[in-house]
From Swiss-Prot:
Keyword Repeat in annotation: yes
Sorted UniProt keywords: Repeat
UniProt organism field: Arabidopsis thaliana (Mouse-ear cress)
Repeat (PPR) residue spans along the chain: 70-104, 105-134, 135-165, 166-196, 197-227, 228-262, 263-297, 298-328, 330-364, 365-395, 397-431, 432-462, 463-497, 498-528
Identification of the protein by name: Pentatricopeptide repeat-containing protein At1g14470
One record GO biological process: RNA modification
GO molecular function, one term: RNA binding
PROSITE patterns found in the cross-reference section: PPR (PS51375)
InterPro entries: Pentatricopeptide_rpt, PPR_At4g14850-like_plant, TPR-like_helical_dom_sf
UniProt-listed Pfam families: PPR, PPR_1, PPR_2
Similarity field: Belongs to the PPR family. PCMP-A subfamily.
Length: 540
């Protein structure tokens, strides 16, 4: 094979769009020449394998065929294992090369350190001995490992050792403080930084958004002397993740007006923000804009679109995208499609899809259990929960238990409910406010108001929804006195009653024969609704 043809094949290999295409080109190189046995060419092919996520047996075969692998081909293999989340293989390769007296370089050391997880910090002494601590890329990974697996103070000690700090050193340290929730130190270090760059500003925006301080996040965003698309994405994500859809859309419109070109991540954030609204009209407008802008729809954008259509109950559009994705489907895609079916009450299609999934996680199980519970099939929800435990591929979490407790409540089966509570206790599953509300609902529906009240009193923070759960229970049982006491407590805590609150209170007064109290409560309502007037008709 001529050198020109060999170079051409190598260039074509780097442009291969699928693994079968790469396989064919590789076969040609093997048939006509022994070049793949050389480190340079093997390195290029392994890089293609990484990009196309080729099977590990195939990539390893290429690596093993190299007669004398140099540092470039070894680094390519490190990168492949890292991209494929094969941490153990990274460490095995490191051990093999070390035995041969070949140590990683500044490029591969970070991959090895990350793969070692919490043991990555043990590489610090070796890194310093080999002189790689001078490389910002290497020392930044060590600092990040301390933040993730030990403490931010340990990372700060490494930071303080650096005589000539780069911007990346400051940014890793500031980010570390945010990860540990230390806003004060993050702000202090940001102000100490000799020159704030785009990354440091973006880290601050992300940090404030993470602690739900969107006012300061926006202040830092507006103060930025120069913004990148990543900065815009950070602010957009802050709004979207905290439920401020309108603010996210306004900012996105500003972005377009100023001529900043959104990337795929931007579109995923904006689409996800619109998903919270579940507004078909907004969905149509966004899809039209995406078509006009000729957005490149990668698998992440398509998955976000699928989820948005599913939440708008447009199951046909969601299914069309699901089918288009083909082999690009991931767990998020499958779970979004299953949730779409459960949302419209089509549990048969949801179950069929679940049964054909190549791989499941806890979200997959939770989607089906919640679907059965919310669609009036409580017994099937419990049965499916038992299947989840039996299969053992996913461990039930807090979300699982909320649906299971709700199902027990609908069945008014306190004996089963007690078994579920015992399971929660034994498996140390912590319940949030939604979990406590489900527990209150379960006891209330089963008629055990004392236990429902006890759980309510255990809640660290109560909101109007928590109160309404208990109000509804008291109303159903006609306990007017306890209802009035609870209303007083609610107001003492500064929580404003809503429509549901007053309907439950008036219903309880009606059933308990508390005519005067009911009339007094009715007069205190600023804008009574039809439900409230209906309750008063019963009180006369």
């Amino acid at each position: 094979m001529s050198r020109e043809l060999t170079v051409s094949l190598a260039a074509i290999a780097s442009q291969a769009l699928t693994f079968p295409q790469l396989n064919q080109i590789h076969a040609q190189l093997i048939v006509f020449n022994s070049l793949p046995r050389q480190s340079y060419w093997a390195s290029r092919i392994i890089s293609c394998c990484t990009r196309l996520r080729a099977p590990s047996y195939y990539t390893r075969l290429i690596f093993d065929s190299v007669t004398f692998p140099n540092v470039f081909v070894v680094n390519s293999m490190f990168k492949y294992f890292s991209k494929m989340d094969m941490a153990n293989d990274v460490l095995r390769l490191y051990e093999q090369r070390s035995r041969c007296g070949i140590m990683p370089d500044a490029f591969s050391f970070p991959v090895v350190i990350k793969s070692a997880g919490r043991f990555g910090i043990l590489f610090q002494a070796l890194v310093e001995k080999l002189g790689f601590f001078k490389d910002p890329y290497v020392r930044n990974v060590i600092m990040d490992m301390y933040v993730k697996h030990e403490s931010v103070e340990s990372a700060r000690k490494v930071f303080d050792q650096i005589s000539q700090r780069k911007g990346s050193d400051w940014n890793v340290m500031i980010s570390g403080y945010w990860k540990w929730g230390n806003k004060e130190e993050a702000c202090k270090l940001f102000d100490m930084m000799p020159e704030n760059d785009v990354v440091s500003w973006t880290v601050m925006i992300t940090g404030f958004a993470k602690v739900k301080d969107l006012e300061n996040a926006r202040k830092y965003f507006d103060r930025m002397p120069e913004k990148s698309v990543v900065s815009w994405n950070a602010m957009l994500s802050g709004y979207a993740q905290n439920g401020f859809t309108e603010d996210a859309l306004r900012l996105f419109n500003d972005m377009l007006r100023l001529g900043v070109r959104p990337n795929e991540t931007t579109w995923v954030i904006v689409i996800s923000a619109c998903s919270f609204r579940a507004d078909p009209s907004l969905t149509r407008s966004l899809v039209k804009l995406i078509d006009e802008k000729r957005v490149r729809l990668n698998c992440f954008v398509k998955t976000a679109l699928l989820d948005m259509h599913a939440k708008c109950r447009d199951i046909q559009s969601a299914r069309r995208i699901f089918n288009e994705l083909g082999t690009q489907r991931n767990l998020v895609t499958w779970n979004a499609m299953i949730s779409g079916y459960t949302r419209i009450g089509d549990m048969s299609s949801a179950r069929q899809l679940f049964d054909t999934m190549p791989k499941r996680n806890v979200v997959s199980w939770n989607s089906l259990i919640a679907g059965y519970a919310h669609n009036g099939q409580a017994a099937l929800a419990i049965e499916f929960f038992e299947d989840m435990i039996d299969y053992g591929d996913s461990k039930p979490d807090e979300v699982t238990m909320i649906s299971v407790l709700s199902a027990c409540g609908h069945m008014a089966d306190l004996e089963l409910g007690d078994c579920i509570v015992d399971y929660i206790r034994k498996n140390q599953i912590k319940l949030n406010d939604s979990g406590y509300r489900s527990l209150i609902f379960m006891y209330a529906r089963g008629g055990n108001l004392w236990e429902a009240k006890r759980v309510f009193d255990e809640m660290k923070e109560r909101d109007v929804v928590s109160y309404n759960t208990l109000f509804t229970a008291f109303a159903a049982n006609g306990d007017g006195v306890e209802t009035l006491n609870l209303l007083s407590k609610m107001k003492d805590e500064g929580i404003e009653p809503d429509r549901v609150t007053y309907t439950s209170v008036l219903t309880a007064c009606n059933r308990a024969g508390l005519l005067k109290e009911g009339q007094r409560i009715f007069k205190s309502i600023r804008n009574p609704l039809a439900d409230h007037y209906a309750c008063m008709d019963l009180l006369r």
